[in-house]
């Protein structure tokens, strides 16, 4: 029989791999499976926090939407919301914002014009391509000049249609203002769960890199997002093509249309033959 430590590890793995927008449903199921609720409570704080930050869940504040991300984490329950220039306190267990304060001191003012320009373009980009998406843009100085980190997360949950999904992308853009190129390294994660008469999940992680010219703050941001948009569109197109190919080949191969002798069985003839045999007894 599994030890309590092993049970906690199994439960943690279930929770961290919960499908998009279905975390609390999985929590309820795991709670019912464990012999004692104390086993779940023992690791809930760290597990819930890991799930929320890795999934970049969106939350509502008094000033609008924000993301809970590792990139914006100040402490275990405080997260920078640079767009609204505030720090939010988030209760990972209750899944709600419990406080807000000014972000003065948390934002590097000497590069804020670049961060703000990227933030503006990120908002436009989300509005155009991810209507349910939320973005967060962080900025800091590095040896290479400026590093802008763009986080985008969008989730859809359609239980009546038996599916849910989340798109997450993190782009790290480094450049020297006004000279050279912007190098943007992206990590895109797509998770889809389909659960009508079964349980099928897609989990894909893709690394991308783009370059774009660096100029003034606004032009730098516009050029960077043109390159990012092209890279994400190519990924989206590739996923669509792969699924089309899988539907026409791979999935069909899982269920053989003809038996091994390549001849269809006449089930009506077999049925009639069986009935005739029964009548002749």
Curated annotation (Swiss-Prot):
Alphabetical keyword list: Actin capping, Actin-binding, Cytoplasm, Cytoskeleton
GO molecular function annotation: actin filament binding
InterPro entries: CapZ_alpha, CapZ_alpha/beta, CapZ_alpha/beta_2, CapZ_alpha_1, F-actin_cap_asu_CS
Record Gene3D superfamilies: F-actin capping protein, alpha subunit, F-actin capping protein, beta subunit
Gene Ontology biological process terms from the UniProt entry: actin cytoskeleton organization; barbed-end actin filament capping; response to bacterium
Domain of life (superkingdom): Eukaryota
Keyword Oxidoreductase: no
One GO CC term, this protein: cortical actin cytoskeleton
Compartments (UniProt record): Cytoplasm, Cytoskeleton
Principal subcellular localization: cytoplasm
Pfam family, one: F-actin_cap_A
Oligomer and partners: Component of the F-actin capping complex, composed of a heterodimer of an alpha and a beta subunit.
Family recorded in the similarity comment: Belongs to the F-actin-capping protein alpha subunit family.
Physiological role: F-actin-capping proteins bind in a Ca(2+)-independent manner to the fast growing ends of actin filaments (barbed end) thereby blocking the exchange of subunits at these ends. Unlike other capping proteins (such as gelsolin and severin), these proteins do not sever actin filaments.
Name of the protein described by the UniProt record: F-actin-capping protein subunit alpha
Organism of this sequence: Dictyostelium discoideum
């Amino acid at each position: 029989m599994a030890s309590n430590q092993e049970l906690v590890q199994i439960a943690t793995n279930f929770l961290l791999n919960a499908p998009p927008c279905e975390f609390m449903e999985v929590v309820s199921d795991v709670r019912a499976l464990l012999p004692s609720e104390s086993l779940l409570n023992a690791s809930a704080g760290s597990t819930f926090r890991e799930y929320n930050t890795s999934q970049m869940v969106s939350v509502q504040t008094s000033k609008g939407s924000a993301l809970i991300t590792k990139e914006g984490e100040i402490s275990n329950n405080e997260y920078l919301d640079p767009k609204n220039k505030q720090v939010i306190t988030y209760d990972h267990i209750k899944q709600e914002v419990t406080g807000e304060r000014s972000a003065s001191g948390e934002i590097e003012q000497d590069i804020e014009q670049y961060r703000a320009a990227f933030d503006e373009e990120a908002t436009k980009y989300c509005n155009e391509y991810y209507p349910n998406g939320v973005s967060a843009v962080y900025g800091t100085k590095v040896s290479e000049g400026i590093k802008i980190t763009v986080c985008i997360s969008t989730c859809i949950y359609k239980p009546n249609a038996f599916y849910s999904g989340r798109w997450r992308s993190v782009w790290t853009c480094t450049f020297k203002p006004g000279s050279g190129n912007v190098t943007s390294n992206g990590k895109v994660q797509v998770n889809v769960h389909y659960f009508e008469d079964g349980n099928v999940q897609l989990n894909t992680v893709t690394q991308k890199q783009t370059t774009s010219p660096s100029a003034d703050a606004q032009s730098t941001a516009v050029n960077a997002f043109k390159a990012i948009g092209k890279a994400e569109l190519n990924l989206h197109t590739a996923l669509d093509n792969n699924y089309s190919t899988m539907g026409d080949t791979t999935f069909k191969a899982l269920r053989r249309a003809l038996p091994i002798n390549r001849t269809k069985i006449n089930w009506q003839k077999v049925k009639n033959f069986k009935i005739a045999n029964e009548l002749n007894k």
